[in-house]
A protein has these predicted regions:
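Alpha-helical protein-protein interaction elements
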Residues: 6-9, 97
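Positively charged n-region of N-terminal signal peptides that target proteins for export
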Residues: 1-4
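N-terminal targeting peptides and non-cytosolic leader segments immediately upstream
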Residues: 18-120
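Hydrophobic h-region of N-terminal signal peptides that target proteins for export
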Residues: 8-17
Length: 120
């Protein structure tokens, strides 16, 4: 997979299961890649907007980040709000279950969230 760095995100493509190709984009900030999601129907833009809004909030603690089942879907939740939902395609690309992937993403975010300093 080739990756092109553009500002806060990395864009790439991944061939999977023969003829099926997914567009995968990674959310990265200050050199830390938080997660790579399948960008279906511009889903990445929504996740990036949510992350940008999160970066403007003062006092977010690692304990505010969790993995939770919301309406039957595994998600990364910050202060009770869904940041990203793990899709079947995400789990397939990462070769794991949706639950495990949401736990990995939540851990990565919680390990680094306190180092994100709001600019305002």
């Amino acid at each position: 997979m080739k990756t092109l760095m553009i500002g806060m995100l990395a864009v790439g493509s991944l061939g999977l299961m023969g003829s099926k190709v997914f567009q995968v984009k990674s959310l990265a900030f200050s050199g830390v890649r938080y997660f790579s999601i399948v960008d279906k129907n511009n889903r990445f833009d929504t996740v990036q907007e949510r992350f940008n809004a999160l970066c403007l909030v003062h006092g977010v603690k690692s304990s505010d980040v969790s993995s939770a089942s919301v309406n039957g879907n595994w998600c990364v939740v910050v202060k009770g709000k869904v940041l990203v939902t793990v899709t079947k395609e995400d789990a397939t690309v990462h070769m794991t279950s949706a639950k495990k992937l949401s736990e990995m993403w939540a851990k990565k975010l919680s390990d680094n969230i306190e180092s994100v300093t709001p600019l305002n």
